[in-house]
Amino acid sequence: MKAAVITKDHTIEVKDTKLRPLKYGEALLEMEYCGVCHTDLHVKNGDFGDETGRITGHEGIGIVKQVGEGVTSLKVGDRASVAWFFKGCGHCEYCVSGNETLCRNVENAGYTVDGAMAEECIVVADYSVKVPDGLDPAVASSITCAGVTTYKAVKVSQIQPGQWLAIYGLGGLGNLALQYAKNVFNAKVIAIDVNDEQLAFAKELGADMVINPKNEDAAKIIQEKVGGAHATVVTAVAKSAFNSAVEAIRAGGRVVAVGLPPEKMDLSIPRLVLDGIEVLGSLVGTREDLKEAFQFAAEGKVKPKVTKRKVEEINQIFDEMEHGKFTGRMVVDFTHH
């Protein structure tokens, strides 16, 4: 089968490879689509260690082709997912308390185990979430990562209907955060991005206010116009966005961090204490979060913007990603092989 494999010089080689036989509790998916995520870029570039030889990809949707011994949660013919959260240990304090993505022995698709950017992929059946009927698999691929990540982040922000949520970064993650915030949580949304194209798209999606921080001070405007945001979700990978988010929040507000810039953020301790501000990290989502995120997409409340590409274009896609050359998500199409 054809697979996108990480090489030692930090590129991707599309080559023929064979998967091992299924073990107890596993299923084999015939892949339909696999989205390309910024995390794949980090893994490919060796930012998390040398992963030479690993099949990349963790935004996969496929049809169950075969199930191993002991599988009860999936059957042949089901459409199911391959996500970054590939499996947890199942018995630690995090796994048993609904915080499974924080499991210290977690496996991640396309990083610690072979991923979904291939014609076939092995999953642990109990950790592979079924896709609801009527949800386009290309669209579903974006929900497995970008969708569930932003849905969970908005959930963690504890935003209430009619409250102001400021979203920093309106790329592949941010535009979905905006849709979940508006169409599921019924919040008022402020979109902040340095790219006017992304802001125009945010406006189309129903943003109540858009700000380009290159031209104006986002935090100052948010404080002046609405008295500060009730919560902020930061998907941008710039330290300046995190610092602005803290300044843009009102007393008692929450800053939810999603993007991963390498630097440290500045945090005024008196502001934190005297204004009772919370700063929280939110990492992807649990299986239950993904099930909910899929359902809202199936109901048409969230529509990821996806562009289908061939697996042979994978290095070009990563190059475009590094230079911020596209809006929405790029999805590799395996349905025509």
UniProtKB/Swiss-Prot annotation:
SMART domains reported for this sequence: PKS_ER
Cofactor(s) it depends on: Zn(2+)
UniProt: Zn(2+) 1 binding residues: 37, 58, 145
Coiled coil: none
Activity regulation remarks: Inhibited by ethanol.
EC number(s) reported in the record: 1.1.1.1
InterPro entries given in the database record: ADH-like_C, ADH-like_N, ADH_Zn_CS, GroES-like_sf, NAD(P)-bd_dom_sf, PKS_ER
Annotated residues for binding of Zn(2+) 2: 89, 92, 95, 103
Enzymatic class: oxidoreductase
GO molecular function annotation: alcohol dehydrogenase (NAD+) activity; zinc ion binding
Keywords: Metal-binding, NAD, Oxidoreductase, Zinc
Pathway: Alcohol metabolism; ethanol biosynthesis via fermentation pathway
Keyword Transmembrane helix: no
Substrates-to-products reaction catalysed: a primary alcohol + NAD(+) = an aldehyde + NADH + H(+); a secondary alcohol + NAD(+) = a ketone + NADH + H(+)
Bound cofactor: record note: Binds 2 Zn(2+) ions per subunit.
Extra remark beyond the main annotation: In Z.mobilis there are two isozymes of alcohol dehydrogenase.
UniProt cross-references to PANTHER family, sorted A to Z: ALCOHOL DEHYDROGENASE 1-RELATED (PTHR42940), VACUOLAR PROTEIN SORTING-ASSOCIATED PROTEIN 11 (PTHR42940:SF8)
UniProt record similarity statement: Belongs to the zinc-containing alcohol dehydrogenase family.
Quaternary structure (record): Multimeric (with different ratios of monomers).
Protein name as catalogued: Alcohol dehydrogenase 1
